[in-house]
Amino acid sequence: MTKKQRYNKELLLEIAKKIKQLREKKNISQDVFYIETDIHIARIETGKLNIRITTLQDICDYFEISLSEFFKDM
């Protein structure tokens, strides 16, 4: 694995962790999240899916935060 690949994987895992924290803070299950957003979040939350920026924007909209707020502490 190259340095860039490691960095990309670490970034995906940080994004995944943040999404899961947001969801758990609102006490929302993955199933409820899917029903309300039509976004399958399980693979995103494990870092196994390279999330598109548009999907991340949809997730941020759902949690009523901006993309800049999402990345603020990362």
Regions found by a protein language model. Name each.
Residues 1-25:
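A short, Lys/Arg-rich alpha-helix, primarily the initiator
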Residues 19, 30, 53-56:
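Helix-turn-helix DNA-binding elements, focusing on the entry/boundary residues of the two helices
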Residues 26-43:
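Short alpha-helical DNA-recognition segment
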Residues 39, 43-46, 54, 72:
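Base-recognition residues in the alpha-helical recognition helix of bacterial helix-turn-helix
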Residues 23, 34, 60:
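The alpha-helix within a helix-turn-helix
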Residues 38, 56, 64:
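ATP/adenylate-binding site constellation spanning eukaryotic-like Ser/Thr protein kinases
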Residues 48-61:
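Short, basic-rich loop-to-helix N-cap that marks the start of a DNA-contacting helix
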Residues 64-74:
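Short C-terminal boundary/hinge segments that cap the last helix of small helical domains
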